[in-house]
């Protein structure tokens, strides 16, 4: 299935975990994204989680909810989440949700 490839290229660099998210994220596959990210965070407690969204042309509010939950989980462990390479539509959605400033 498509969902297996949602999160790729996961690697750890010092105390940072880097991962790339791929594809449009919406109600159908945001639960898969959530599962992937929470599993990653169960295995590791990174000081920084850096998510490359270059290959995410679109996400809906369910995907944003997953990102916020991920952020809260990482912050609880004293870490930070960074979203990089945002495409315009995704950036616009985060701005509308007034979230563009919390993922920095």
What does each model-identified segment do?
Residues 1-20:
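Short beta-strand/loop segment at the start of cytosolic alpha/beta domains
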